[in-house]
Amino acid sequence: DLVRSRGLGDVYKRQGELSSLSEWDSIRLDNLGIKTIIDLRTNQETLTAPIKYTKANILQIPISVGKIADAPQRVIEGRMRKGDAGVYMEDEYLQFVTDNTDQFAKVLEQFQNEDNYPILISCSYGKDRTGFLTAMLLAALDIPRDAIMEDYLTSNQYIDTSHLADIVKHLSTDAQESITVFLTANEGLMDLAFHKIKKEYGSTEKYLSKGLRLTD
């Protein structure tokens, strides 16, 4: 579902993947006048489930997700041990800072041209890659950290897992718990990313200016 982030008005929306849009979903995008869709999914993800909406300029800027790319298959095959999911998620959020800063900077370049507005950012569930990017946008607007976190956690109100019901009921308890971890926006993960930013750059402000190349 579409999420409107605090402080960004009608310039920017975030959402999970757009490969299975209903007719109603397409109408909503039409009504919003979305001009640019930035897809943060990996090449493999977009090949498997391409975006079919044709009324906006679609840019693919893939953000790598580390070990978590193999997680769904590991869960289904029963190879996900208790506690693995949390480690995988931590690895993903750390890699946002260590391995994907240039890619996130490319995304933010699109906001420098108002002809691209409104912009919709999309990934698999609209909470991790998109959630981190949104947090950086809000930080650049001097939104307080607690408000940034509140915005990030709103993802939990919109993630629809109904399509997984038939699969999940046949899985082990460990596998079911892993899926819950993967599909939950967790305050600790975003805190981990901010701590990594401080360690690598000294402050969020320096990360925004030196890493993400944002200027006043």
Where are these regions (language model features)?
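Short phosphate-binding/catalytic loops that engage adenosine nucleotides
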Residues: D1, I34, I143
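Single conserved hydrophobic/aromatic residue that forms the stacking wall/gate
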Residues: D1-Y12
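Cysteine-based protein phosphatase catalytic domain of the PTP/DSP
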Residues: Q15-D115
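A short acidic (Asp/Glu
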Residues: A49, F132-L133
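PTP/DSP superfamily signal
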Residues: Q103-D115, L133-D216
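Residue-level preference for the first positions of well-ordered beta-strands
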Residues: N116-L120
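Ser/Thr-glycine-rich phosphate-binding loops at phosphate-binding pockets of nucleotides
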Residues: Y125, R129-T130
